[in-house]
Swiss-Prot record:
Broadest EC class assigned to this enzyme: ligase
Annotated pathway: Purine metabolism; IMP biosynthesis via de novo pathway; 5-amino-1-(5-phospho-D-ribosyl)imidazole from N(2)-formyl-N(1)-(5-phospho-D-ribosyl)glycinamide: step 1/2
Residues binding Mg(2+) 1: E90, N527
Binding site for ATP: Y49, K88, D489, G526
Active site feature: H46, H92
Record's keyword annotation contains Oxidoreductase: no
Organism: Granulibacter bethesdensis (strain ATCC BAA-1260 / CGDNIH1)
Reaction(s) the record says it catalyses: N(2)-formyl-N(1)-(5-phospho-beta-D-ribosyl)glycinamide + L-glutamine + ATP + H2O = 2-formamido-N(1)-(5-O-phospho-beta-D-ribosyl)acetamidine + L-glutamate + ADP + phosphate + H(+)
SS bond partners: none
Subunit record text: Monomer. Part of the FGAM synthase complex composed of 1 PurL, 1 PurQ and 2 PurS subunits.
Enzyme Commission code: 6.3.5.3
Name assigned to this protein: Phosphoribosylformylglycinamidine synthase subunit PurL
Length: 724
């Protein structure tokens, strides 16, 4: 069923009056219903990045080890031994609020396709999740659905979920964030790209059949939520991980031949986006015959087929003489294979259905010449200095509260639902180290992987928060001994039409840029998710960062577990500020002050020292300092190693719980050598304790048993999920 095309319909589809007038000018006539649908999804924020492209161009994307940066399906970096790592992070926020299980599951499926479409076998999944307040009535249901969706899809496909992070905050009550990251490995000289070439070459559809699920999903992801959000369930796609597994194997088998000229997954905006992007990048036209599209529902019209976001589908341009080879491979894997069109020299996308031309649109205005806005920005006001904050409970009592608080408590309930070791290459499992470590099959080397962001810092000062997210990612890779190579970003923000939101976005980009430049840590891929608001209430600005590093020897990867007899050396100083700290929020009940400053030169200097010490074999365990500060980090190491510690540091609650940056705890039997190396590198360092016994002993405090800390640490999520 179609309707007459009017301004009112265009606005329903997400276009504003000026954009609709632009469509009329481009077409020289009123567009058809299908043409309007194509314009609306291609010009949505989700596909066009029309509010963010101006700012994203400021991020550094080049380095000698970067093979492909932003613009392809995923980023590609040289990791040595003739191999490339291909990785990206992407959001599935809006679908995961409406239908948590399928929203999260198809988020995993979509990011897997972005990676294997470039020729990589996926070797690891990670995620970054933000949920509402633990006491909000929807939070438990959303956590349950999201975690089951991620685990169900990843486990069935056979790709380990090796790491991630979780935050809780009331700003996510009506808008959880589900950011999924996949990493794959490919020969660096066998990377497959999406630019179509060769007028007359066939356009091939492979994978699952097309249904009505997900229609206008890209448009739904480009608007904020209201009271009718539950009615948007039909715009959430339905995933089938078993078909995805078959699709991975079939595509990789075909990629071992010389049949493929270009390949693209059908993600947001489905067949529309994949065909427009492939032809647009290649500078050719494309003609589609929708009668040939495999369909699983009867009576689908052109609009529905072009905008469906049914999962597990790919579009390819093949060499005509290799078409039979490709067909045989996909039929062997019991997947649909159909010739649905060909490339032309018109520079247009032409869509035919039942002998009727349903769409004929020039490609450039849909892609490269899509609307681009430099929206007004308002800077986030600087927070007033915090001043002195009294300690109302004491050091020991605060630790028992913090170690079990929502943002610090163990995530075991979550990661136990993920298969983190399928494939047999996982060296460091969730919770065992600051970053996941995955061995490169057939070599001694390994990848280190992590996701990081501190949204409360970003809300207080987006520029500092953006820099801190990149710096913490770099620290976590460093803490396992990896050389950090590159990042992927997932920019989760509110309504870009509000100047204060665009001000947050622009400032976060500035902070990220400075951190990436100072740390030689380029951005090679990413995703922007805007309109994360419900009934006018926006999320905390959340520029999630996914980081990738490489270790020359997987066996040298450092964990965070203490063992008896190790000295504890603090790299950096004790805490000096409580601004935006978890101590301030959980103990004092406040969320004010500026976040801790980020000294990027110190980050570089301190991290390079730590990595050097790990490579010299002088570090038995290492943990970066972040949420909760120094004492929480030591407690986490004690819990991981089932070992206590006697601490010698003299300090107040600011010293123990301040969240100053550029800091690590090193556990070592070479403390004198570590301190000498730190002095030579102009890095502050001090001996602050020794691992022994079964209690954590802080000067002036009653000892706390590690067993008690573990019990508190493990209790939060099981208790939350057991509530009725």
């Amino acid at each position: 069923m179609t309707r007459d095309v009017t301004l009112s319909l265009a606005q329903e589809f997400g276009l504003d009056a000026a954009e609709y007038q632009r469509v009329l000018d481009i077409m020289g006539r009123t567009p058809s219903f299908t043409e309007l649908g194509i314009f609306s999804v291609m010009w949505s924020e989700h596909c066009s990045y029309k509010s963010s492209r101006h700012w994203l161009k400021q991020l550094p994307t080049k380095a000698p080890w970067v093979i492909h940066g932003p613009g392809e399906n995923a980023g590609v970096v040289d990791i040595g031994d003739g191999l490339a790592a291909i990785f990206k992070m992407e959001s599935h926020n809006h679908p995961s609020f409406i239908e948590p299980y399928q929203g999260a599951a198809t988020g995993v499926g979509g990011i897997l396709r972005d990676v294997f479409t470039m020729g990589a076998r996926p070797v690891a999944n990670l995620n970054a999740l933000r949920f509402g307040s633990p006491d909000h009535p929807a939070t438990k249901r959303i956590i349950d659905g999201v975690v089951r969706g991620i685990g169900g899809y990843g486990n069935c496909v056979g790709v380990p979920t090796v790491g991630g992070e979780v935050n809780f905050h009331p700003s996510y009550n009506g808008n959880p964030l589900v950011n999924a990251m996949t990493v794959g490995i490919a020969p660096k000289d066998r990377i497959f790209l999406s630019a179509a070439a060769g007028v007359g070459n066939p356009v091939i559809y492979v994978g699952s059949k097309t249904g009505r699920d997900g229609i206008h999903g890209a448009t739904m992801a480009s608007t904020e939520f209201g009271a009718d959000s539950e009615e948007k369930r039909p715009t959430v796609q339905v995933g089938d991980p078993f078909t995805e597994k078959l699709l991975i194997e079939a595509c990789l088998e075909l990629m071992a031949t010389d049949a493929i000229i270009a390949i693209q997954d059908m993600g947001a905006a489905g067949l529309t986006s994949s065909s427009v992007e492939m032809a647009g990048k290649g500078g050719v036209g494309i003609e589609l015959d929708l009668d040939a599209v495999p369909q699983r529902e009867e009576g689908m019209n052109a609009y529905e087929m072009m905008l469906s976001e049914s999962q597990e589908r790919m579009l390819m341009i093949l060499r005509p003489d290799r078409q039979d080879v490709a067909r045989a491979i996909f039929e062997k894997w019991e997947l649909d294979f159909a010739v649905i069109g060909h490339l032309t020299d018109t520079g247009h996308i032409v869509v035919k259905h039942q002998g009727v031309v349903e769409a004929d649109i020039p490609l450039d205005p849909l892609a490269e010449q899509a609307p681009l806005y430099q929206r007004p920005t308002v800077e986030t006001p600087k927070r007033a200095p915090l001043g002195e904050v009294a300690d109302p409970v004491g050091i020991a009592s605060a630790l028992l509260t913090l170690i079990g608080s929502p943002d610090i408590a163990s995530r075991r309930w979550i990661w136990d639902q993920y298969d983190s070791t399928v494939g047999g290459q996982t060296v460091r499992r969730p919770g065992a180290a600051d970053a996941a470590v995955v061995r490169l099959d057939g070599t001694e080397r390994a990848l280190a992987l992590t996701t990081d962001c501190t949204p409360r810092y970003c809300f207080a000062d987006p520029e500092v928060g953006g820099a801190q997210a990149v710096a913490e990612t770099w620290r976590n890779l460093t803490a396992v001994g990896a050389h950090p190579l590159a990042i992927t970003d997932n920019m989760n923000f509110g309504n870009p039409q509000k100047p204060e939101i665009m001000g947050q976005f622009a400032a976060a980009i500035r902070g990220m840029r400075e951190a990436c430049l100072t740390l030689d840590f380029p951005v090679v891929s990413g995703n922007v998710s805007l309109y994360n608001e419900t009934e006018g209430t926006g999320i905390l600005p959340t520029p999630a960062i996914g980081g990738l590093g490489v270790l020359d020897n997987a066996e040298t990867a450092t964990g965070l577990s203490l063992r008896p007899g190790l000295d504890l050396v603090l790299i950096g100083t004790g805490g000096t500020t409580l601004g935006q700290s978890l101590w301030l929020r959980e103990i004092a009940g406040r969320e004010d002050g500026p976040p801790p400053a980020v000294d990027l030169a110190a980050e570089r200097r301190h991290g390079d020292l730590v990595r050097s010490l790990i490579h010299q074999g002088k570090v038995a365990a290492c943990h970066d300092l972040s949420d909760g500060g120094l004492l929480v980090a030591i407690a986490e190491m004690a819990i991981a190693g089932h070992t206590g510690a006697v601490l010698s540091g003299e300090g107040d609650h600011v010293f123990w719980y301040g969240e100053d940056q550029a800091r690590y705890i090193i556990a070592t039997t070479y403390s004198a050598a570590v301190l000498d190396a730190a002095k030579a590198a102009n890095v502050p360092a001090s001996l602050i304790g020794r691992a022994e016994g079964t209690d954590l002993q802080v000067p002036g405090c009653t000892p706390i048993s590690v067993a008690t800390l573990r019990e508190r640490h493990e209790a939060f999520l099981p208790a939350l999920m057991a509530q009725r």
